[in-house]
Amino acid sequence: MKCLMKILGFMLLATISSFTPAHHSHGNYEMTEYVHLEGIVRQLHMVNPHAWIYLEVMQDSGDEEMWALEAGSVRALTRNGINEDTISVGETVSVRCHQLRDGARGCLLGFLTGTDGVERLWD
């Protein structure tokens, strides 16, 4: 009987833990420093598990680069007062973000300042 109770307890624990929300780390981003970017919002995706902004950034050379900015979840952004109307495609914004460790044009978005001049937390 003790053995059966242990097995049932283990099965219950395994079942419950499978419903526990999981999340990946930010280990692929350089979390100790911010990159400052200014550019034009080309795409905005307010989707879960993370919102995404695609930002067209003009380099000193005149070349344009597309950056992918990973933001927080839609629920977290909503708690911070951010929604689909906070910024618009075509709007020029400045951001502070944590770049990917491999140097690729991707960031974990920290702060975004829109044309209204208000800096908002996007993580």
Language-model features, listed with the residues they occupy:
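Sec-dependent signal peptide recognition
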Residues: K2-F10
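Short boundary/loop segments of OB/S1/cold-shock single-stranded nucleic-acid-binding domains
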Residues: T20-V35
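Conserved hydrophobic positions within beta-strands
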Residues: G39-V41
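Short aromatic-glycine-enriched beta-strand elements
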Residues: V47-M58
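Short, structured beta-strand/loop micro-motifs enriched in basic residues and often containing a Trp
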Residues: A71-R79
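Short nucleic-acid-contacting surface segments enriched for D/E, G, S/T with interspersed K/R
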Residues: R79-S94
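OB-fold/S1-family single-stranded nucleic acid-binding modules
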Residues: L100-D123
